[in-house]
Amino acid sequence: MSARGKARSRALEVLFEAEQRSVSAFDAMTARREKTDLVINPYTVEIVEGVVSMQATIDEFLQTYAQGWTLERMPSVDRIILRIGAWELLYNDEVPDGVAVSEAVALAKTMSTDESPAFINGLLGRLQKLKPSLLA
């Protein structure tokens, strides 16, 4: 797994832990730093900060374009993978759009249900097509 792939996985873990424990993502990241001697990859921090800062907008896009699904009905892991993928797709110009989608699908293949990769691919693919109008 690439360094950025590992950073995405760690960001997923931090955001998932924060959601499950009802704490801020920054508190979850701080707790992780204190529990281990491992240095948190700067890209993990960038993802967490980006997702947190744009979460309301990202959630609105996901809610609008997830046909037949509410955010609350989605498995937590899928919801967080979608947030990470949407942030990379829409707000991180360093990551090509196709890479943002494929990396989110790869995370879903290893971290979620058998049905999740197709769902995540479809929803992020839709956001990718609509990107110019979403960011206008």
Curated annotation (Swiss-Prot):
GO BP annotations, alphabetical order: DNA-templated transcription termination; transcription antitermination
GO molecular function, one term: RNA binding
Keywords, in A-Z order: RNA-binding, Transcription, Transcription antitermination, Transcription regulation
GO cellular component: cytosol
PANTHER family registered for this protein in UniProt: ANTITERMINATION NUSB DOMAIN-CONTAINING PROTEIN (PTHR11078:SF3), N UTILIZATION SUBSTANCE PROTEIN B-RELATED (PTHR11078)
Family note: Belongs to the NusB family.
Chain's role: Involved in transcription antitermination. Required for transcription of ribosomal RNA (rRNA) genes. Binds specifically to the boxA antiterminator sequence of the ribosomal RNA (rrn) operons.
Record NCBIfam families: nusB
Protein name as catalogued: Transcription antitermination protein NusB
Name of the gene encoding the protein in the UniProt record: nusB
